[in-house]
């Protein structure tokens, strides 16, 4: 009997080390940044069983077999659609400003589609304005509405949006609503999905969270886009979820969420429409390619409109394109660079680019919320402050709520707004969308918003920051080490 126990123990020990060796090899063979690989290996070696399970759940980009197959199947038709769109030459910009030229070239080469001109654009800086505008535009819809959000939380003006959507669906407007399963969990537990479906709205739960399938698909891969498309002509996107801040996360202790949304009219809606169609087909298998814009009847403002490039990121889209876009934007700065983000956990490349810009004499501002809804990300963000401050970056901690706006403004001319946080999940994992606007008028609008944020912020003084308690530095370094995993 003793011999049997000994054999069993040796077999278990051998299996244990074989499992660790196998996962280690798997980590090393995947193409990833060295800091990320080292962080995963540290977790696996310190807490082997917990580390292995965590890695299998969250360590690899896995869309799931069915979605991955759909993602591959949709590209031939999508590529043909993009080629057909290029035939509408009047909607594509042929010139860009000096600061924007490299970024637009990058996006065109990586995505196959250039910047679109002739768009009218309005920056909505309050959730009330954005929600009321949505209610109005949805009520005017004639043909179709496509909506995708990470979070849909009932309450306040959001309920008016829901009622408007159901009303137009009842009169025959084709309405599609796709919401992330994790972000909109409260919505899917509410009566609204049944009410909307009864009204004729096609409601889809994206990337369904299921404990039975945790090892078959990465559970923290989320549908993080925020888009509303109306009649293939009106479009919205930005940092705002479908929530009324007066009713959203009031017990989090961070104040109301502060966001921006962009309302657009013009061919940019077509570019956003193909992104939605890809997401919809990946999730449902249904192909819904948007119609090409009719340049003969749509009132595109060729002379006064904005030039916009749409960047889509996530599984099935050009890998790393948003990361490249941010790097290109930062290195293009010559006078001023202003960035706002709720979560500041940049890659090494982005960190060095920001520091280099400041050391070249560019006036660099980063605006982050003083109080964050994620303790882990809050500590990890502070771990980068010392290096940024030493390089000459001005860091502002916003005190008027949870600043959720994601924006970049380069030299007052080149603007980036959308859903992308400066963290690893947004940069490399989630389905995201970013608008690139080459226009000094829009840049002036965004600058006014950012200046208001700065006025409501506290500037971090390097000397004061250097005197923070030693225990805080220890906690910061701990989270800094694991920042590639956040």
UniProtKB/Swiss-Prot annotation:
UniProt cross-references to InterPro entries, sorted A to Z: Cardiolipin_synthase, CL_synthase_A, CLS_N, PLD-like_dom, PLipase_D/transphosphatidylase
Domain of life the protein comes from: Bacteria
TM regions (residue ranges): 3-23, 38-58
Similarity field: Belongs to the phospholipase D family. Cardiolipin synthase subfamily. ClsA sub-subfamily.
PANTHER family given in the database record: CARDIOLIPIN SYNTHASE (PTHR21248), PHOSPHOLIPASE D (PTHR21248:SF22)
Keyword terms: Cell inner membrane, Cell membrane, Lipid biosynthesis, Lipid metabolism, Membrane, Phospholipid biosynthesis, Phospholipid metabolism, Repeat, Transferase, Transmembrane, Transmembrane helix
Listed GO biological process terms: cardiolipin biosynthetic process
Gene3D superfamilies the record matches: Endonuclease Chain A
Reported function: Catalyzes the reversible phosphatidyl group transfer from one phosphatidylglycerol molecule to another to form cardiolipin (CL) (diphosphatidylglycerol) and glycerol.
Source organism: Sodalis glossinidius (strain morsitans)
Catalytic activity from the UniProt record: 2 a 1,2-diacyl-sn-glycero-3-phospho-(1'-sn-glycerol) = a cardiolipin + glycerol
Active site, per annotation: 224, 226, 231, 404, 406, 411
Identification of the protein by name: Cardiolipin synthase A
GO molecular function: cardiolipin synthase activity
SMART domains (alphabetical): PLDc
Main location: membrane
